[in-house]
Amino acid sequence: MQHSSFIKRTFLGVVALTIVLGLLIWGIGPNVIKARQVDLLYLGQQHLILVFNSMALALLVGIPGGILLSRPCARRWAEYAMQIFNVGNTLPPLAVLALAMVFIGIGDKPAIIALFLASLLPIVRNTYSGLCGVPASLIEAANGIGMTKGQRLRQVELPNAWPVMLSGIRIATAINVGTAPLAFLIGASSYGELIFPGIYLNDFPTLILGATATALVALLLDIALAGLGRVLSPHTAE
């Protein structure tokens, strides 16, 4: 049942994507897309570079951070620590970009730092929540068969927390992809190079092209992550 439900949702997603692409081509015209084909490919590559680099940093910091905070000795400090990890979401994205530009300069590096901060909280919080939500009976069973703390974490806690962790990663990725166009304002290449000139010049087709490309990247990455969840946890991933 779960397998057929997943196939049905995937099919409906592909149909919806096809309809959106058809409406896009009809609305702005194939000539605009053809004229911007090189820009779409190049800016898409640059957009993904920003997303992948910043998400890699967020995963390297967020997952260990969530694991550490989920340990019994650290749980009382968890909510205080979450406020620190939340700095990228508390401040407006433009303010984070501006601060990063002041300290680091312009280009990809400040953009990656700002996107890293914006993506951090969902990963930390969902890792923490997923690990704290592992049934106590499983923990007791692992202890009962003589597992060490490391073995228990790797073989019991993380596999059971994975669906919740993946949900946080998907949320963080969507935030990251949607925020990345703002990096254009501090000299980093992304689909913002289509969106913001489209706004300034009242060039509606270029604006829609950049916004739609950004939305499609977010959708495709989310589908890929959902598929990864099905592979790694076929009985629980959604």
PLM segments and residue spans:
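Short cytoplasmic-facing helical segments at TM-TM junctions of multi-pass membrane proteins
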Residues: 126-168, 191, 195, 238
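Transmembrane alpha-helices
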Residues: 117, 149-183, 209, 213-214, ...
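Glycine-rich helix-loop "coupling/hinge" segments at transmembrane-helix boundaries
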Residues: 102-103, 179-214, 233, 238
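C-terminal transmembrane helix and the adjacent membrane-cytosol boundary/short C-terminal tail
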Residues: 3-11, 208-238
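Cytoplasmic-entry segments and transmembrane alpha-helices of multi-pass inner-membrane transporters
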Residues: 50, 65-100, 123-133, 140
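Faces of alpha-helical transmembrane segments in polytopic inner-membrane proteins
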Residues: 61, 65, 85-93, 113-128, ...
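Periplasmic/extracellular loop-to-transmembrane helix junction in inner-membrane transport proteins
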Residues: 2-3, 19-56
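Loop-to-helix entry region at the N-terminal start of transmembrane alpha-helices
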Residues: 10, 42-50, 54, 101-122, ...
